[in-house]
């Protein structure tokens, strides 16, 4: 597995009104590398991610795309033995999966997903070409929650306390899954916020925990449509974010009966959808 951080010596520039100072100092940056995802021999997509928890990421991505519903549908997940770098070592940047739908009548629509998945660490709307497609994905049923505001305001700080890679680099997002009692069950960090969410959801999927009723997806980023949709596909009834919520995220949360809050900072937040306890 590749490194998740890289150490550099970089010029540090300080500019004042009268003089510019330049000093060399050590810096730690987050690693971003491609992960090529192959499903049943088909090159589905290449996503830019922070190495680590790759199999969780892919499970979460396949769930979000509607290609799987249960971890048992992924019969094999392995790194490609032929993916080697200039040093003749395995780069662990090509992941091959064998997927067999639990329902034999359900076909894997790899072509439409493959055609539209972009190559990015902020992958955005994955595998879709229209608003109708965005809204048509069917995940686990949502059972609404009524979270306590006093619990909600504690979650960003709890998430921040577990952002070890951010402490070192300042360059990654974090996602966490919390119970309604405010316990963080799992936290993942990545250069892409969507990757972080996929890793969290993929972890729970691989441990047989779906649907994720009575939980909240906690994000260190803004609350975009894609994150709300990923949560909905996993049956997560609530999303909170330290940043803003987008219009489509709000509309989607309201239509799905989900709870959504943004700008959760200090003792305040904006309440966009759902009911409070």
Swiss-Prot record:
Coiled coil: none annotated. One of its GO terms (molecular function) is sulfurtransferase activity. GO terms for biological process: Mo-molybdopterin cofactor biosynthetic process. InterPro entries: Cytidine_deaminase-like, FdhD. Mo-bis(molybdopterin guanine dinucleotide) binds at residues 263-268. Transmembrane segments: none annotated. The active site is at residue 123. It is found in: Cytoplasm. Keywords: Cytoplasm, Molybdenum cofactor biosynthesis. Belongs to the FdhD family. Required for formate dehydrogenase (FDH) activity. Acts as a sulfur carrier protein that transfers sulfur from IscS to the molybdenum cofactor prior to its insertion into FDH. This is Sulfur carrier protein FdhD. The gene is fdhD.
